[in-house]
Amino acid sequence: MDEKGRLPDAVVIEHPAHAGGHLGVSNLSDMHDPRFEFLRVLEELDAVFTSLGLRREDVPLIVAGGINSHEAVRELLSAGASGVQLGTPFAVTEEGDAHPNFKRVLAEATPDDIVEFVSVTGLPARAVKTPWLMRYLRHETKIREKIGALKHTCPTALECLSVCGWRDGVEKFGHFCIDTRLAAALRGDVANGLFFRGREALPFGTAIRSVHDLIELLLTGATRPAVAGRWAFSLG
């Protein structure tokens, strides 16, 4: 509730052990802390809402991170969530406007292909082990020692972050231009891009399916055969 007494439109509860991209924890070691488990958080929020004189339905609670099946959706809704939020499964749908290589990298990634690291924002992040990212992580310690405390001019002049480890010389943060790396991923540049991804398997495995098929699977559990002649492929 803000100073004017207004309630938030919704609250998103992200599980850092499963979600992709930037994660809501201070340290990499905190990702698997039991306090982030969805069922525990939803239960504890009941007590918080009661102490504030609120009902559960007053503020929608949306859970995010690793949700990849109809069964998972049902379990979370039954536990009191108002809805679910998915990122990676929608990013690899037919309708997604990213390069096919972007979708391939996300769809074919196995658990061993995914890594957690500290981003230029200072937050832990999760992404696929692409050639550039692994090269950066191999030299991360040396980079911090040599240039970590040095300030740099934003290479894109976009100033996309209020605080940036590379631009502002924050030694403990990551040191690279995140806008450049994300743009490379969107273009399908596998060698040089940063491909954020959640940790869990995707609903259709390595197959690229439509948004309609994905929503139908999540809501009903039904899996339709891929439509012949429609742009779709499998990497498995």
Question: PLM ranges: what are they?
Answer:
Residues K4-A10, A79-V84:
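Glycine-enriched alpha-helix->loop->beta-strand junction motifs that scaffold or abut catalytic
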Residues V12-E14:
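Catalytic beta/alpha-barrel core
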